[in-house]
Amino acid sequence: MPLNRRDFVLSSAAFAGTAALPGLFGGSIARAQQPLRILFLGGTGFLGPHTVQYAIDRGHDVTLFNRGRTNNDMFPELEKIVGNRDPEVDQGLSGLEGREWDAVIDTSGYVPRIVGASANLLSDRVGQYLFVSTICQYNDWLEGDKFRTEDWPRGTLEDPTTEDVSTHYCYLKAYCEIAAEAAMPDRVTQIRPGLIVGPRDNTDRFTYWPMRAERGGEMIAPGRPTDLTQYIDVRDLAMFMVHCVEQKLTDDFNVVRQAMPWGEFLDACISAADSDASLTWIPGDFLSEHGLEPWQQLQMWSDADHPMSGSLTWSSARAINAGLRIRPVEETIRDTVAWYQSLPADRQAEMRSGIAADKEAEVLAAWHEHQA
């Protein structure tokens, strides 16, 4: 079943403006042997800036194309072409006409007509089109067998011409993939990320858990320690995307870390916090009876036998074999917490995901009464 974008959007558009993203990749970054001319369609949201920064650090010549409305102060040293992804709005794509690049990285495509317009316009003047899709473009992506591969069929819509992204975000991405492939056969890289997390993720879906561990005390641990969870650090995703362009890899890739035990993830959150947080494991059916549901209040978790468990157990073997590198969960937790704690106090006080403190206390009390 398709999931509404309002319920689950895998890449956040919320982003705090900055002129650069120094130091987020750690250590010195080797320069690419052959610098490329790379055009970014978008590049100023959440994933885009991380990818732009890594491409710059690798020595590539980067151009940004967007409307010039979001985080316009970012990357002042780069060439910026102002336009609109929709060729029917304002100056449309006219700023791209007559130009050539080695590769395009499209982080802002949501409607097949619009993705097709850019891919067709650039088909004779770029060598490779890398499109950022989503893991939820697959048919019945929430359900089904665990560790499904890129061979799983795409989702379909009764009306593939719809442009209602808020309702059909997931399966519209599947049609965007098809549009890009039709314009540039055998020259498209389809990147299908799972939940994108890390520094500058303003959704708080990942961040809630380590920050809750920081608070200490008794903490709800939904389900069982053996349930599985899965995500991708935005920096690992960015590095793999640039790697695909540098190596001219044209394939479909699920880009997620290998599924890990849920208990291991929560233990890592507590260890990183060095707090007195203690886990109280509560079955999913009890939590549901008390208004706590997977991917609503309980982000990143689903019971192993829940209809949504397939969302957290995709295979990333193809991407790993192609060069995807996954940093330790402890590093993602540490850096995300450090970023979050650098935000203004009023923002930190308004966690955007997770269980409200009073609700957690209420459910814990009900659980202990039930156990008694």
Regions from the language model: what does each represent?
Residues 1-19:
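N-terminal secretory signal peptides and thylakoid transit peptides that target proteins
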Residues 41-58:
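N-terminal Rossmann NAD(P)H-binding glycine-rich loop of SDR-like oxidoreductase domains
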